[in-house]
Each structure stands twice: as C-alpha cells, then as structure tokens.
C-alpha cells in the first residue's frame, strides 16, 4: 500500500459557507479522507488492512486518536503492532451518539493524522460533516462498524464488540 503525505491546510470552518452562496470547500481534494469499515469480528482483515496505514501515519508529527466508547486499548498490542504508544490518544466511555461530534471536532483540529471512531450507522449529514472536517484538518478518519455477528436467539444481546486482543 502506498501512502502519500497530505498537504497542510488551514481554514476557518465558519468561513466556508455563506447564506447567500452555495456551500463550497476551498480545501484541496486530496487533503483529507473519511472511510467507513464494516467488518466481521470473526475475520480480522481490517486489522491487516489498516495496520500498515496506521504505521505510516504514525511517522507524522501528529497524534493517532482512537474514539472507543467502551473498550481500553492494549499497550502490549500497540507495541507489538509497531505503533508508537507516545503518539496514541484514546477517548473512551463517551456516549456512542456523541462520538460523531467528537470525531468531527478532532478531525477539525488538525492535531491528528488519523481518527478512528466506532460509530453507529451514519446519516448522510454526518458523512458530509465528517468529510468536511477531515479536509479542513488534513486528516484521515476511519469509521469502524463491526457487523452484527451475534446469532439471533442465542441469548446474547447485539452489542458493539472490538477484537479483544486489541484491548485489556
């Protein structure tokens, strides 16, 4: 996988649209990215796909942010994966519905090369807001959503799960 460095870009979020003109973004088209990953927890292919990109992005001077509402990242997994512990920030125990807003704000700051968020299903408005924030912050945003692999009728609730080996 080849990764291209992102050009720095700074703009005032509120100056991008006006009431008398159509919405527009002055950011270059390659200055940010939002991707949604819907994955099966039984097949950790997402880890295999994302890890090289995360390792590359960790070489930037900016942070890597993990928005994980319920779980705690495993320091041993970070070390084993080659991700710098001193550049990883994690916010957890936040309301999953507030995670979209938290992700948008984090992307806008420009302090993070990548923001990973475990989010509920996004609305089109959420997608637009996150894309704009990623462009303005010159960052990657990865929306992570595991498929509901829990069998109906097995007595288990449908909950958000993250691979346990990633967390304590």
Swiss-Prot record:
InterPro entries: Cell_div_suppressor_SulA, P-loop_NTPase, SulA_CellDiv_inhibitor, SulA_enterobact. It comes from the Bacteria. GO terms for biological process: division septum assembly; DNA repair; negative regulation of cell division; SOS response. Keywords: Cell cycle, Cell division, DNA damage, Septation, SOS response. Is rapidly cleaved and degraded by the Lon protease once DNA damage is repaired. Induction: By DNA damage, as part of the SOS response. Residues 161-168 are annotated as: Lon protease binding. Residues 106-112 are annotated as: FtsZ binding. Coiled coil: none annotated. Pfam families: SulA (PF03846). The record marks 168 as: Essential for degradation by Lon protease. HAMAP family: SulA. Interacts with FtsZ. Component of the SOS system and an inhibitor of cell division. Accumulation of SulA causes rapid cessation of cell division and the appearance of long, non-septate filaments. In the presence of GTP, binds a polymerization-competent form of FtsZ in a 1:1 ratio, thus inhibiting FtsZ polymerization and therefore preventing it from participating in the assembly of the Z ring. This mechanism prevents the premature segregation of damaged DNA to daughter cells during cell division. Belongs to the SulA family. This is Cell division inhibitor SulA. It comes from Yersinia pseudotuberculosis serotype O:1b (strain IP 31758). The lineage of its organism: Bacteria, Pseudomonadati, Pseudomonadota, Gammaproteobacteria, Enterobacterales. The gene is sulA.
């Amino acid at each position: 996988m080849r990764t291209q460095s992102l050009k720095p870009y700074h703009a005032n979020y509120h100056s991008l649209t006006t009431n008398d003109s159509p919405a527009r973004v002055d950011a270059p088209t390659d200055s940010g990215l939002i991707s949604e990953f819907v994955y099966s927890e039984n097949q950790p292919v997402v880890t295999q796909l994302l890890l090289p990109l995360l390792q590359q992005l960790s070489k930037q001077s900016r942070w890597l942010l993990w928005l994980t509402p319920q779980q705690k990242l495993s320091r041993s997994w970070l070390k084993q994966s080659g991700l710098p512990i001193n550049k990883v920030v994690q916010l957890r125990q936040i309301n999953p519905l507030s995670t979209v807003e938290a992700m948008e704000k984090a992307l806008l700051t420009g302090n993070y090369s990548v923001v990973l968020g475990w989010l509920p299903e996004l609305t089109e408005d959420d997608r637009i807001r996150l894309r704009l924030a990623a462009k303005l912050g010159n960052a990657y945003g990865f929306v992570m959503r595991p498929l509901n692999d829990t069998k109906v009728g097995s007595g288990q609730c449908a909950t958000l799960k993250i691979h346990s080996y990633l967390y304590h």
